[in-house]
């Protein structure tokens, strides 16, 4: 390959990567907005997950898994955002059963949406999404593509 073709290919690859970051960033912003409007509380596994969601812009009540038994859940719409590995799946089922038995309504659709975004970037933990969001913000705002 000649030098011009190599440079063109590299520029195309960089634009493609930048566009993927922009898409991930936009999806995360939209999902954060939906969560803030549609649920009363969010349950996560631990403190790092809580911090990650706060930094992503979640303003609703965030409850860690070990605190959930001490909360009044009656009539609340709750999203359960555990990790996307086998342990997280099992914990998600246990927490969801507990919430429903306590009179709450579990909104599973948000876990599925978060999982979709995370798996596109190879992420299996909620706390790792903070790094992806930061990378996406840098790519979006440094590229001049943000409107």
Positions of the model-derived regions?
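Short glycine-rich phosphate-binding loop at a beta-alpha junction
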Residues: 41-42, 79
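Phosphate-handling DNA/RNA-contact segment within nucleic-acid enzymes
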Residues: 1-41, 47-52
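TOPRIM fold recognition
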Residues: 2-13, 47-56, 61, 65-147
